[in-house]
Structure formats: structure tokens, C-alpha cells
Amino acid sequence: MAEPVQEELSVLAAIFCRPHEWEVLSRSETDGTVFRIHTKAEGFMDVDIPLELVFHLPVNYPSCLPGISINSEQLTRAQCVTVKENLLEQAESLLSEPMVHELVLWIQQNLRHILSQPETGSGSEKCTFSTSTTMDDGLWITLLHLDHMRAKTKYVKIVEKWASDLRLTGRLMFMGKIILILLQGDRNNLKEYLILQKTSKVDVDSSGKKCKEKMISVLFETKVQTEHKRFLAFEVKEYSALDELQKEFETAGLKKLFSEFVLALVK
């Protein structure tokens, strides 16, 4: 990461220092940095509108535009799109220099004007844009498979922390050489978890050097159905036999999932 970008991130962290105002979602030498800022901007009738701004700074930023997404429970989807388009237009005038704080200040000062534009007033569906896609409401469930864990104790603690931070429930399951992570929660948070899992140095390689998880696969993802159990917590569990693992899935209403995806790992 270039030094000016590192400095910009440090400054942003210092500015947005209140609880939940600032959060780094992922860092990668190849994909850049993704972070979230929670702020407010003045709308109609001098009412403050809460905004969730997600920025993706590519590795060649600020020579290129950052990726931007907008989310607000008080704005429609059309309004979110218009706000984003205006923000990107403003970003074009700031190319080649750190711009995130300038963009946040600009949207705080100009949101009311943007919302007064006729094309932003139509539609009643609330805006739920996230880092890269629109999220559906309700709980989702995903099943991940890990090839191995060399630094198991440390790895498990990291997974538990991520699950807690992202308000995800489910199971980290060990059965012989099989390692599965079953997660349940908001789909946006599940995707954030996967970004962390793939971009953070969570394990060590054969020489003991810290490394990223390169051997993870998503076996299954779907919206939670009525027959699925709602997990109340995230737990780490070890099973001595396949039938114990199968019972865990059956109790959770995931018998078909076990048959289609887990059994294939045993063969």
C-alpha cells in the first residue's frame, strides 16, 4: 500500500473515531482496501439522514477512482443510486490525490441539493446497497470447507472473533481431517466474513510463515428456510464419528445439505 494511502487511512480512522463510525472490512495487496464509514448528512427540513458509505480503494488509487456504495434506511434505492453517481462525479475532479474525506464532507454539504433533484424522488423501495451487490432481507446460511488448519488455536480464535463482530451464528466443525464452517446471519455480513477469510493472514504455511487462506470453498449458500434451525450462538465442536456430524446437520434441518455436500468430502 502506498504511503499516501496509509496516511489517508490513519487520518480517516482518527476523524471517524466514535463507536461504529469507522471499520476496515478487508485489506489486500492485490485487491486494495475496503472500509465503511457511518456518518450523517442534512436532508430536507434540516433532518439528519444516516449514511453508510463503503469505499473500495484499489491498489492504484488515487490514480483511479475508488469504488463507492451507499446505504441508508431513509433513502429509496433510486436516491441511493443518484447520490452515488454524484459522488463519483465529484471524485473525478479529485483524481491523483487522497479524496475520501473530501468526498464525505462534500456529501454532507450537498445531500439536500441532490435529493431535491426530480429524478431522486420516485420509488418507495428502501436502499440496501452493500459493498458490491444488493442484499436480500432475512437470514442466510452458508457452508464453507477448509482444507487444513496448521495454526489451529489461533485460527479458531480469529474465526470466533469474526463471527462475533459480524453477529453470525453457527458452527466450526472438526471431524477427522474435515473442517467445516456453517454460518447463519445477514447475507451482507456473510459476504464480509468471506472477504476477511480470504484476505487475512489467518494460518501459517509449511515453513511457519503467516499466510492467507487459499484453500477455502463455499459448498452451499441459501436463504434460511422454515425447516432450518436458527442457531443462537457460534460454537466450535469436534466430532469423533461421521454419524455425530450427520446428527448435527439433521438437528439443524440440513439433512439434504449433509447428503449432497458433506458426504462427498468423506469419499
Curated annotation (Swiss-Prot):
GO cellular component: cytoplasm; nucleus
A biological-process GO annotation: positive regulation of hypoxia-inducible factor-1alpha signaling pathway
Domain RWD: 7-114
Subcellular localization, as worded in the UniProt entry: Nucleus; Cytoplasm
Entry-linked CDD domains: RWD_RWDD3, RWDD3_C
Region (Interaction with UBE2I/UBC9), start-end ranges: 13-15, 100-102
Induction comment: Induced by hypoxia and heat shock.
Alphabetical keyword list: Cytoplasm, Nucleus
Xref: PROSITE patterns: RWD (PS50908)
Listed InterPro entries: RWD_dom, RWDD3, UBQ-conjugating_enzyme/RWD
Tissue specificity of this protein: Isoform 1 and isoform 2 are expressed in glioma tumors (at protein level). Expressed in a wide number of tissues with highest expression in cerebellum, pituitary, heart, kidney, liver, stomach, pancreas, prostate and spleen. Low levels in thalamus, spinal cord, esophagus, thymus, lung and peripheral blood leukocytes. A higher level expression seen in pituitary tumors as compared to the pituitary gland.
Main localization category: nucleus
Family annotation (PANTHER family): RWD DOMAIN-CONTAINING PROTEIN 3
Function: Enhancer of SUMO conjugation. Via its interaction with UBE2I/UBC9, increases SUMO conjugation to proteins by promoting the binding of E1 and E2 enzymes, thioester linkage between SUMO and UBE2I/UBC9 and transfer of SUMO to specific target proteins which include HIF1A, PIAS, NFKBIA, NR3C1 and TOP1. Isoform 1 and isoform 2 positively regulate the NF-kappa-B signaling pathway by enhancing the sumoylation of NF-kappa-B inhibitor alpha (NFKBIA), promoting its stabilization which consequently leads to an increased inhibition of NF-kappa-B transcriptional activity.
Free-text note regarding domains: The RWD domain is required for the sumoylation enhancement activity.
Subunit structure: Isoform 1 and isoform 2 interact with UBE2I/UBC9. Isoform 1 shows a greater interaction with NFKBIA and HIF1A as compared to isoform 2. Isoform 2 interacts with NCOA2 and NR3C1.
Protein name: RWD domain-containing protein 3
Organism the protein comes from: Homo sapiens
The gene coding this protein: RWDD3
